[in-house]
Amino acid sequence: MDLVVSGSHGKGGLLTLVAPGHPHLAFIRKLMDLRRKSVHRALCSIMKEAEEKNIKITHILTDNGTEFTDTLKIQKITRAMLFYTHAYASWEKGSIENFNRIIRRFYPKRTDFSKLTSKAVENLQEKLVNYPRPTQLKQKVAA
């Protein structure tokens, strides 16, 4: 779980959650601001969607950002174990960082995410879930 933050003049951001070990089980939610309450609301929405799709998220890996520090609340919302990476160790959550890098291909650094519609965020999630990954390309070539 991580945030992709709007540019310096923008507001809000995107909350991203990738199911560990499954880069194609990913969720994106738009946040109007970066406060804990907004993150909790977005997490509720993600968990509802995961439940509808019959996806079980058993554990979540995130960084030590202030928006993720309410461990008990997040565990209550997600019903999953929450693990934190070490400070400045983004490689410890490589799949989410790679997912965020792909988002930046569509929406560069200066993007104001508060101006995105919820439909645009849904479309982005669908695109990225089906986005070809290098491991998939190797498998297709070998077949």
What is each stretch, according to the model?
Residues 1-15, 109:
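Mobile-element integrase/transposase regions
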Residues 2, 17, 24, 43, ...:
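Mobile genetic element proteins and their domesticated derivatives, centered on retroelements
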Residues 10-22, 72-75, 96:
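A glycine-rich, aromatic-flanked flexible loop/lid motif
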Residues 6-10, 18, 28-53:
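Active-site beta-loop-alpha junctions of metal-dependent nucleic acid enzymes
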Residues 23-25, 52-58, 106-107:
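Short, surface-exposed connector motifs at secondary-structure boundaries
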Residues 55-70, 88:
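Acidic/histidine-rich, metal-coordinating catalytic segments
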Residues 72-143:
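Charged alpha-helix within mobile-element recombinases
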Residues 23-29, 84, 109:
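Short small-residue beta-strand/loop micro-motif enriched in glycine and branched aliphatics
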